């Protein structure tokens, strides 16, 4: 083994912890919050499920009228013509957008007033380090969430308790106004990333993220090393993270009707756990693709340790655009499409179409955003784009994914929405991360720890409340010759797919 490979942490180099138990809340009032509160064991139940301001009060007509009306007025005032209008329009479009979104996000009312906020002062939840910040945000004067996030990463403010617990009460101490720093990131970084998504750009942005260290990911993903949503099988039971991930892999294999000896391509395979599961439990011949060298080393090492020969299954370090141009019985891609980019999504699906046998099936799992957005959704999403998933921009409402798949030549066979399952998964990731706090800070520093701590805690909430969700889609080629009747037996929802895998004794990774 080369010296370079020796420096990569493999499964035997990691001491995995058992997911710590959830902490009791310090902030519960015991009073009626105005709506029913759930008591499921599978997720952290929200104490204040507040519907914040968003598209319910946002007027596209008013925005459009302002964008056109201001340059029209200036053109009339100065006695100009069409060229003058174009000049003033180009001059004013960005300031108008910034001013409009700032005003709307600051002064729009909540979508509804059902939830009663405790009304505690800001300092009950968070503690500022600088006197000027204490003077600026105190009592009922709430801090913009984006400003708070940046200050928290810089160590200028602390939570007065467990991060997730305090974030559950964020509507009592923060607002969701768009800030100048947020606009600078959108214009100067986010839009630039969205425009291109070249291979070189993706390697520059994606590879350092997933090659940041296998130990970094192991500290929250646990022994399965799966960076996608698990599945809850029983809301009244707190399944382990490993059980939830096994549930998901079993469902994937059943939904595509995977059979022994079939070839399967897993695009964006991560650390290769699905490839190992499908190889061991279903006898498939799997090729996994990842752009990350550390993931490739881990995945192949785990396959060999499980007794799976390279002739059967392997992980390749390769950009999806360089995928082997051969035909596969089944294709899977779990939450890698976000890195493809909105502009390239249909072309990517068409590439998959060309690599899939005519009677094959493809499983697509993608994160999504709701059409009925709230301002918090954008602020959370841009935090993720800046610090966690740089360049990942293809999280959209469901209709856009369906359109891209159909334009690529596919027919949608089935769809499940699993956002709340993601919340349960993230809850366990968050507890793992907090449980490894000392090791993380010792190697990566306190800022790195805080970036991911806030991401995981906030995402637990975002996926539970609908800010973000996740879709499982199974598609087949939309050809007259596609034997659709053969797919009826595998046309499962979540419960049916998992039951079929359990009945066959294939639902747990050995």
From Swiss-Prot:
One of its GO terms (biological process) is methylation. It is a multi-pass membrane protein. Pathway: Lipid metabolism; sphingolipid metabolism. It is found in: Membrane. Belongs to the CFA/CMAS family. The keyword Membrane applies. Glycans are attached at residues 55, 175, 294. It is an enzyme of class 2 (transferase). Disruption phenotype: Leads to increased resistance to cell-wall-damaging agents, such as calcofluor white (CFW) and Congo red (CR). Accumulates unmethylated glucosylceramides. Keywords: Glycoprotein, Lipid biosynthesis, Lipid metabolism, Membrane, Methyltransferase, S-adenosyl-L-methionine, Sphingolipid metabolism, Transferase, Transmembrane, Transmembrane helix. It comes from Emericella nidulans (strain FGSC A4 / ATCC 38163 / CBS 112.46 / NRRL 194 / M139) (Aspergillus nidulans). Catalyzes methylation of the sphingoid base component of glucosylceramides (GluCers) at the C9-position. Sphingolipid C9-methylation requires 4,8-desaturated ceramides as substrates. Glucosylceramides play important roles in growth, differentiation and pathogenicity. The methyl group at the C9-position distinguishes fungal glucosylceramides from those of plants and animals and may thus play a role in host-pathogen interactions enabling the host to recognize the fungal attack and initiate specific defense responses. It catalyses: a (4E,8E)-4-sphinga-4,8-dienine ceramide + S-adenosyl-L-methionine = a 9-methyl-(4E,8E)-sphinga-4,8-dienine ceramide + S-adenosyl-L-homocysteine + H(+). This is Sphingolipid C9-methyltransferase B. One of its GO terms (molecular function) is methyltransferase activity. S-adenosyl-L-methionine binds at residues 227-228, 264-272, 290-295, 320-321. The chain crosses the membrane at residues 62-82, 84-104. Its EC number is 2.1.1.317.
């Amino acid at each position: 083994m080369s010296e370079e490979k020796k420096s990569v942490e493999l499964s035997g180099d990691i001491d995995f912890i058992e997911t710590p138990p959830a902490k009791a809340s310090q902030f519960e009032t015991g009073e009626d919050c105005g709506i029913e509160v759930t008591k499921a064991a599978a997720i952290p139940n929200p104490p204040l499920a507040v519907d914040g301001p968003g598209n319910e009060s946002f007027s596209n007509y008013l925005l459009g009228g302002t964008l056109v009306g201001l340059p029209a007025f200036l053109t009339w005032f100065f006695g100009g013509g069409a060229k003058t209008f174009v000049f003033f329009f180009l001059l004013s479009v960005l300031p108008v957008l910034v001013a409009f979104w700032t005003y709307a996000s600051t002064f729009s009312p909540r979508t509804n007033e059902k939830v009663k906020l405790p009304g505690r002062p800001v300092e009950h939840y968070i503690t500022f380090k600088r006197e000027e910040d204490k003077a600026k945000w105190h009592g009922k004067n709430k801090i913009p969430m984006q400003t708070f996030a940046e200050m928290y990463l810089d160590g200028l403010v602390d939570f007065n308790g467990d991060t997730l617990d305090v974030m559950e009460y964020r509507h009592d101490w923060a607002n969701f106004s768009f800030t100048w720093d947020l606009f600078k990131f959108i214009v100067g970084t986010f839009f630039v990333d969205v425009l291109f998504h070249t291979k070189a750009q993706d390697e520059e942005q994606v590879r350092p993220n997933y090659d940041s260290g296998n130990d970094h990911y192991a500290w929250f993903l646990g022994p399965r090393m799966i960076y996608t949503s698990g599945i809850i099988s029983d809301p009244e039971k707190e399944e382990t993270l490993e059980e939830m991930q096994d549930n998901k892999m079993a469902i994937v294999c059943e939904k595509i009707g995977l059979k022994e000896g079939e070839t399967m391509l897993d695009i964006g395979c991560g650390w290769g756990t699905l490839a190992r599961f499908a190889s061991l439990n279903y006898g498939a011949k799997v090729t996994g693709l990842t752009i990350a060298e550390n993931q490739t080393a881990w995945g192949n090492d785990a396959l060999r340790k499980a007794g799976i020969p390279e002739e059967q299954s392997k992980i390749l370090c390769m950009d999806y655009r360089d995928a082997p141009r051969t035909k596969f019985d089944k294709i899977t891609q779990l939450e890698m499409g976000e890195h493809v980019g909105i502009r390239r999504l249909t072309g990517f699906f068409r590439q998959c179409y060309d690599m899939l046998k005519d009677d094959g099936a493809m499983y697509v799992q993608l994160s999504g955003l709701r059409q009925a957005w709230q301002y918090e959704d954008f602020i959370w999403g841009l935090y993720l784009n800046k610090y966690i998933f740089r360049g990942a921009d293809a999280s959209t409402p469901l209709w856009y994914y369906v359109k891209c798949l159909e334009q690529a030549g596919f027919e949608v066979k089935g769809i499940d929405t699993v956002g709340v399952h993601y919340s349960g998964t993230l809850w366990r990731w968050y507890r793992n991360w907090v449980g490894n706090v000392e090791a993380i800070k010792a190697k990566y520093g306190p800022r790195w720890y805080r970036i991911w701590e806030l991401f995981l805690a906030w995402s637990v909430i975002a996926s539970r409340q609908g800010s973000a969700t996740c879709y499982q889609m199974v598609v087949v080629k939309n050809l007259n010759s596609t034997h659709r009747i053969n797919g009826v037996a595998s046309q499962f929802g979540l419960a049916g797919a998992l039951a079929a895998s359990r009945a066959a004794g294939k639902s747990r990774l050995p």
